[in-house]
């Protein structure tokens, strides 16, 4: 009995520790703005077990941070295949989770993480100039969300920026009706989650509702948004546009919180709940400067908030599962004591307590949030400067993108990732 318990503890706990420990070095290298070395560090410990999806997601993100957009999408495609495979969790894994802990199950990704796969795959295609392929990812965002809603009885966590990006891609392809639908969906999700409506989305809704002759909807937006003038579709077609995305810091990390709860019959039970710890911000916002024109970024996506919202939404189900598991472990300890004496019962009870750890896995290379800006410019060559603004409101770093040449109706998308200094 003692040998069995020790082997069980080693098998369960060593697998959980190895992934998080290896990521500490990855995070340190990212904070030093060395994504290529971070990728090499990650690839030293490839995961093919319960953490295989996490490995693929982190690998894909580190590849795109290193400018390897094609390779990144190869990894994202592998992740999508695996997500589909894991969608129906096997009964064996469910049993393991019910008797040991949730970390024994293959990680299939939170709702917002699954949607983020398509967001970043689409951005990769845009970086490669493959707008048709980006459009396919936009369609897959909608399909993935439909499946998640069916699985969650309509309670899936939605990402407003995913809808916005879909609209942006459709608009680039001249599919204005579909773009309007996507922008409208994005607007409604921002409202539902009580988040500020980004200025760029307000402008898009006004521009397309007017272009599509949606008179009543246009009047509604005019009343809601304090915007005096918006470029028309025709005006944008005659200009170029600089689009900026800043992927700031890293998504929150999960920690384990010990709680004492009581069953319906008054039995005291120790459970471990996952809780999120936010990463520090690197900047407050940024300013895109093109000649005499400039625009300040706004936060359009917060994976920090989406992660917390996801945990809050699923908290009741998580607690119910944890209590059920704790009761099973208590019962196993009592049975061991009845059959093998007090020592056997104690060993099983200790094993139950030690293996009762929260599932603290998550996609760690996602950013904390995404800053976004759009700036229409005349066709031609422009020198582009990025000013990063710190918490005190001062410029803390300047990035020179150099000269960029645009044609009429062409969009140039610029991306940068900035990770705050590492703190353990």
For each predicted feature, which ranges?
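Short loop/turn and low-complexity linker motifs enriched in small/turn-promoting residues
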Residues: 211-424
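TPR-repeat structural position
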Residues: 35-36, 69, 131, 176-177
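Boundary/linker segments of alpha-helical solenoid repeat arrays
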Residues: 51-54, 83-94, 147-156, 187-219
């Amino acid at each position: 009995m003692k040998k069995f318990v020790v082997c069980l503890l080693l098998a369960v706990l060593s697998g959980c520790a190895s992934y998080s420990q290896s990521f500490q070095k990855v995070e340190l290298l990212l904070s030093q703005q060395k994504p290529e070395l971070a990728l090499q560090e990650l690839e030293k410990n490839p995961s093919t077990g319960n953490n295989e999806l996490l490995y693929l997601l982190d690998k894909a993100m580190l590849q795109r941070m290193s400018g390897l957009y094609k390779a990144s999408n190869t990894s994202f495609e592998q992740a999508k295949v695996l997500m589909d495979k894991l969608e129906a969790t096997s009964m064996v894994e469910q049993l393991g989770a019910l008797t040991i802990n949730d970390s024994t199950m293959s990680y299939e990704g939170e709702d917002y993480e699954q949607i983020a796969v398509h967001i970043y795959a689409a951005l990769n295609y845009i970086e490669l100039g493959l707008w048709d392929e980006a459009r396919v990812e936009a369609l897959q965002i909608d399909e993935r969300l439909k499946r998640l809603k069916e699985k969650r009885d309509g309670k899936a966590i939605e990402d407003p920026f995913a809808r916005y990006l879909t609209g942006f891609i459709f608009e680039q392809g001249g599919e204005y009706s579909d773009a309007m639908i996507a922008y409208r969906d994005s607007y409604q999700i921002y409202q539902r989650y009580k988040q500020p409506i980004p200025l760029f989305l307000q402008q898009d809704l006004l521009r397309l509702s007017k272009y599509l002759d949606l008179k009543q909807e246009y009047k509604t937006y005019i009343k809601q948004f304090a915007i005096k003038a918006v470029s028309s579709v025709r005006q944008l077609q005659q200009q170029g546009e600089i689009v900026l995305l800043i992927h700031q810091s890293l998504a929150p990390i999960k920690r384990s919180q010990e709680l004492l709860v009581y069953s319906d019959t008054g039995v005291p039970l120790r459970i471990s709940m996952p809780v999120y710890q936010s990463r520090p911000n690197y900047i407050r916002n940024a300013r895109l400067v093109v000649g005499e024109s400039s625009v300040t970024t706004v936060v359009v996506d917060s994976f920090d908030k989406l992660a917390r919202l996801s945990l809050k939404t699923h908290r009741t189900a998580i607690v119910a599962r944890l209590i059920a598991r704790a009761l099973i472990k208590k019962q196993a300890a009592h049975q061991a004591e009845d059959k093998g004496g007090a020592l056997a019962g104690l060993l099983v009870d200790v094993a139950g307590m030690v293996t009762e750890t929260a599932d603290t896995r998550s996609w760690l290379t996602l950013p904390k949030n995404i800053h976004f800006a759009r700036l229409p410019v005349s066709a031609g060559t422009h020198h582009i400067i990025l000013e990063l603004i710190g918490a005190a409101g001062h410029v803390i770093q300047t990035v020179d993108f150099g000269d960029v040449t645009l044609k009429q109706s062409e969009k140039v998308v610029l991306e940068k990732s900035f990770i705050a200094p590492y703190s353990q």
